[in-house]
Amino acid sequence: LLDVLFLKSVLFCHEVRMICSPYFLRDALSLPYLNEQNTMNRMKHLICVFLLAAFGSCSFKANAYTERDMLQKAADETTLKNVLVMKQAWVPYPAYTDRAAWDSLMGPNKQRLIAAGEKLLDYKWQLIPATAYLEYERTGNRKIMEVPYDANRQALNTLMLAELAEGKGRFIDQLLNGAYMSCEMNSWVLSAHLPRQSSKRSLPDFREQIIDLGSGGYGALMAWVHYFFRKPFDKINPVVSLQMRKAIKERILDPYMNDDDMWWMAFNWQPGEIINNWNPWCNSNALQCFLLMENNKDRLAKAVYRSMKSVDKFINFVKSDGACEEGTSYWGHAAGKLYDYLQILSDGTGGKISLLNEPMIRRMGEYMSRSYVGNGWVVNFADASAQGGGDPLLIYRFGKAVNSNEMMHFAAYLLNGRKPYATMGNDAFRSLQSLLCCNDLAKETPKHDMPDVTWYPETEFCYMKNKNGMFVAAKGGFNNESHNHNDVGTFSLYVNTIPVILDA
């Protein structure tokens, strides 16, 4: 115990610079006497190894923001304009009326989605009163606003999937109700993010629209509902579709093009500031809205290229080694949302503008499989949860897009023999994308096969395992990383997937 406490104090006293050759550490972990039964000796040996790591003669300075500008190098605005696929011809899903195609795509998901929709036929769309928004500035409680907000959004997404699955019009009235109610809201922004308005208050100000994680996702969902059901809506009353277009334009399209000060776009980024998962997350949602709603080629090209310049800021900020400094819990929103954005961009340009073959993007994807210890445990640096593993359907389609067998096998491994079913929740894009890969994932070989050593020199993460069931994760870094809470020089030790020492 004293040895462990000493190691902890050493690791925290200075920014740890990991030894340049982690393979030395791997070899050290494999020394013959590790097969002895004396667990204490093994642990002491391991601690000595990490002291060597901490005081290694060769240090590695973490790279700062790097002007890669990968997307802008892939195409300028003129090239982009020439390759844009217009009038939603890029959408990879059948038309709502093509029932045979939907039956084929839905497969075993069909009855499950219809049953979920049937539970919402009598759903009462929830009003969010002014006091629910104000509660955030009064007490800091954001849930009182977010719970009914998210219930409405999930209901709208589920009803969309149910109607696409069945195609008989049973869910159209409820979809109409949900879309109409959504348009009647003053804002789709979460109360906790509304203080970014000029008023600095948590009550929506109808005179100003900003884009956050909530409004972007809500706008994308509304854009998909409009795309699939505009014609049946118009048969009932065309005012609803008109109102949807107006709401999406005013809340997403216009502020996206006219406001350079939204921090997550990073157009005014300064050294020392953080660019985190908000960037690809919000940009992926905005890109869906533009590709689904904007049919003027000049305006669309300007919007898409603006998104490319913004996402380049995120790619420039993250480390090229592929690690997610925000931790495994945020991987789906950081690297995962970057993948979503790149997939949408590739689809919207007929595959002409794509970074999915870039090694850096693949490394960002494989970070999740490398960070999985086993039996539900993951390396939880920063404020990530210690248990998880990620969304198998997201991991699979990411892996397939970047040609990573490791990720595809890992996705099947996470299912643990269960059948893959379409994702529901509130994310329309991921729900729809999950339909495209369920059948292939069901046939994939389940395997979690990672190297003995994974070394992230820029982010300063190192993972090591050996044949005796030991898995060690160590972190250098510094405490101005996104979602980091003084995780400077920390480590975790797992034996047979069970956490033994967690330096929390």
Identify the function of each model-found stretch.
Residues 201-327, 340, 439-444:
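Active-site lining segments of carbohydrate-active enzymes
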Residues 151-161, 210-227, 275-291, 331-343, ...:
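Well-ordered alpha-helical segments within folded domains of soluble proteins
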Residues 117-128, 175-193, 240-266, 302-322, ...:
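Long, well-ordered core segments of solenoidal/helical folds
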Residues 65-137:
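Low-complexity, Ser/Thr/Pro/Gly-enriched N-terminal "stalk/linker" regions
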Residues 90, 140-152, 164, 199-215, ...:
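Solvent-exposed loop and edge beta-strand segments that line ligand/cofactor-binding
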Residues 1-2, 11-14, 18-66:
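Bacterial Sec-dependent N-terminal signal peptides
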Residues 335-502:
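Carbohydrate-active enzyme catalytic cores, enriched for enzymes
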